[in-house]
Amino acid sequence: MKKLFLDANVLFSAAWREDSGLWRLGKLPKAKLLTSGYAVEEARRNLDDDEQKRRLTMFLSKIEIVPDCPDQILPVKLAEKDLPILQAAIGHRADFLVTGDHRHFGALFGKNVGGVRIISPADVMKRFD
């Protein structure tokens, strides 16, 4: 079973729209979903209404929330707000970091960083669906 660490923007997007295809991630039979408390709080902070927050809570019921790993050394430079995401993915030995953040992770897409391959949600569905 592969461990998929979900970035805050994936959590946010799943909660934003009731019909988001990201809900399919929770049904992948060969994947274990992880995220961190930091990612959850970032997603929650950016949601506007109670219905979206309710959907986030429902989506999180399919995901293991792991501790942050602030002492994890990173082999790459990232924006300050993205450091805890990659640190937790590496620290918890995720196979993949799933993110839609092309602005900050774009140059790293498809690459292994500290043992974690950075991919988009669409790439996950191609690999696992």
Language-model regions: role of each:
Residues 80-97:
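Acidic, metal-associated active-site segment
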Residues 1-19:
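Metal-dependent nucleic-acid phosphoesterase active-site entry motif
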Residues 30, 64, 93-94:
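Residue-level detector of structured alpha->beta connecting loops
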Residues 29, 61, 112-114:
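Short, structured coil segments at secondary-structure junctions
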Residues 37, 100-102:
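Short secondary-structure boundary segments
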